[in-house]
């Protein structure tokens, strides 16, 4: 029998405070445990199949914020999709995102995958970006954006596919 943890029940023992390991529950809480920069081990998050909104997402997105230990967000197989939420990075470095489809993003940021500010050494590759929920502006009928990068350096976007997007790749 194969038992897999879900995005909301997966656990990891990580050094959150510098006083030893604590158990974090859920994908977002595990990522948040890296924010205080006490944990130095790299983290690989692997997803399989259709992933709907995790229970704890800031503003409707999976958020990588102030992480420097190195995180890989990886889809396993040919059908991994983040359905109904996006992935946002802020103030982070050494992040890899690969082999994930993004669709129906309905978060407050509005981007399937957004590098919002002060990121460096980020690689987004072999991903599929589909349209999101309509935004408030006339040019946002199919969502705000698919893959947006703002005030970030040493970023590579490679071998990605954009499907029926109104806006697809902002660099600013």
What is the predicted role of each segment?
Residues 7-11, 20:
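Short polar catalytic/cofactor-binding loops
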Residues 69-79, 93-104, 119-134, 145-146, ...:
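Right-handed parallel beta-helix
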Residues 20-41, 53-72, 80-98, 104-120, ...:
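Extracellular beta-strand-rich solenoid/capping regions of secreted or surface-exposed proteins
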Residues 1-6:
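Conserved small/polar residues in nucleotide/adenosyl-binding loops
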